Amino acid sequence: TSGPSLNETNYQAWKIQRQLINVWLDDLKWPELKNWNCSQKTWNEGPFGREKDFYGKNNENRNSMTTDGSARIFESLMTNEIIPKGENEHLKQLFHRSLDPVSRKKDLENQVDGFLGEGLPFSSKLWSKAGLMSEVRHDVAWWKAPNKNPMLAVVFTTGKELVKDQFLLPA
């Protein structure tokens, strides 16, 4: 959990726990995940305490992912490759996005508007995970239109101007 900086013994134990996700990803032995780091929480205002310590003085331990790796992970989740079907339905629900305009208006952080799903027909089904922070606008989207095969798209952008561009990804 987050909190103030820790003494060295507790900090080392905390780091081991935080790195477990990276150990699991490494154990998959997928080339798309080489050099990935998914051990950091995301922050609106920046990390503090032990989280800031863990990022490193120059943020050298920040999260680092790729579009290829994100595509592989998301497809594997959606096709039940890495988590058996009965066990990942809850996870899929977390990624499910409503395309209904009324529902989207009620949720300003809906991860559809300003992202890949915004341009889809309302009859489609969408599962996605957007990332929007001060310098990145990312999206991983899996959708299925009626009577069509599922589609997957992954877009990562970097730059303060692109972060503000609400029309870049839905285009």
Label each PLM-derived region with a short phrase.
Residues R62-T67, A71-A171:
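Structured C-terminal helix/loop/strand segments within mature extracytoplasmic catalytic/sensor domains
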